[in-house]
Amino acid sequence: MLQNMTEGAPLKLIIPFMVPLLIGNVFQQLYNIADIIIVGRTIGVNALAAVGAVSPLFMLTMVLTIGLSNGFTVVTGQRYGAQDMQGMRRSIATCVVLSVFFVFLIMGIMHLVIDPLLVMMNIPPELMEDAYAYVMIIVDGLLAMMAYNLLSGIMRSLGDSKTPLYFLIISSIVNIILALVFIISFGWGVPGSAFALVIAQAFSAVLCVIYIYKRFPQLHIHRSDFQLDWPELWAHLRMGLPMAVQFSVLGLGIIILQSVCNKFGSDQIAGFTTAMRVEQLALQPMISFGIAMAVFTAQNFGARRFDRICDAVHRCSLLTLAFSLFAAVVVFAFGEEVIGIFLDNPSPTVMESAHLYILYTVPVYFFLSQIFIYRNACQGMGVSMIPMLSGVVELIMRSIAAIYLSVPFGYEGICMAEPIAWISCAIFVFAAYHYFVRLLEKKYTLVD
C-alpha cells in the first residue's frame, strides 16, 4: 500500500518504511557476498582476486540498470497514482522498449572496449583469464539483470514493496545453490560463479513476470501500447538518464580506485575486495535510511511541509550517527573474523591489506552516513543536481587521492582515498542542503 508521510511523527513513519528496504539491501549484498565466499574458499586467492579486480565493472553495469529502471518507473507510478490505466500501460511498454535498447547498447559498448579497459585497470596477467570470463558472462547476461530491476521497479511504483523482496530472497538462495553446484560439482571455476548469478537473476525476473501477469491484469500490455512517440520516450528518458549518470559517476570512481589497487598484486586485491564487501554489509542501515529519507522528503516537499523535512533530517542524522558508531564498533571488533570467512587459510598479506582498509575507513563512517541523509533529502526536494554534483565531488577526490597518495604510501594510499572522498562529499552536501532548504522554503512561503 502507498503510505502518506505528511502526517504523524517522522521517525514512526520512516523506520517502518526503512525496514523492508534494509532487508532487501542486505539480501542484495548477501547475493554478491555469497559468490565471493564460495569462490574464495573453494578455488583460492587468485580466483577471489580475479572477481574482485573486475567487480567495479559488474557494479557499474548493475547501477546503470538500476538507475535507468528506477527512473523509467517513476512515470509508471505517477500514472498509476492518477488512475490513468492506458497511460500506465503505455509507460510499461516504453520502459520495455527503452530497457531493451539500453541493454544492447551497453552490451555492444562493453564488447568493444573490454580488452583495452581490462588493460587500463591494471589486471595482473595471472588473473586476466578468469577476470575476462567473469565480466563477459555478466555483460552477456545483462538482460536478466535489467529485467528484474525493471519489473521490481514497476511493482514498487504500484505500492507493492514486499513482493520484490520475496523474489530477491528466493533469487539469493538459487544463486548460492547454483554457485556451489557449478563450482564444486561441475568444476567450472570462476565462470561458474558468473553463470549462477545470471541464471538466478533471470529466475527472479520470470517470477516477477508471472506474478505481475496474475496479480495485475490491468497491466497486460497490447500491441497498441507500443505505438510510441518522442514526448512519451522523453518523459521516461528525462527521469532515467540523470539517475543512471549519477550512479555511473560513483561507479567510475570505484573503477579508478580498483585500477590503482590492481597494481599491487593478488593478495592486496583479495584483501581490498574482502574488506569492501564487509563494509558494504555494515553500511546497509545507513543506505536504507537514505532511501527512506528521499521518499519522506518528496512527499513533504509536495505538501510544502519544510518544518517536517528539517525535523526528519535532524532526527535521521542523529540516528544514522548512532548506526555508524555501532557499525564501526562491530567492524573493528569482528572484522578479521568476518574476513576469514571469505578465504580458506588467508595469507598474512591478505589479512593485513583488509585490516588496513578497515582501519582507515571505519573512523569516518559518520561522514558517509550524513551523505546518505543530506543527499537523499536534496533528491526528495527535487534539487537533482546536488546528488549528481556530489557524485562528481566523490569521483574527483577519490581519484586524485588514490592516484597521488599511492605513489609515496603504496597500498596504504588507496585506503586513504575513501575517507578523503567521503569527508569532502559530506561537507558539500551538508552545505548544499541547508542552502536549498532555506531557499525553497522562502520561495514557496512568498508564493503562498
Q: Can you say where each PLM-predicted feature lies in the sequence?
A:
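Transmembrane helical elements of multi-pass membrane transporters/channels
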Residues: 16-35, 137, 148, 171, ...
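Hydrophobic transmembrane alpha-helices of multi-pass small-molecule transporters
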Residues: 60, 175-179, 205-209, 281-284, ...
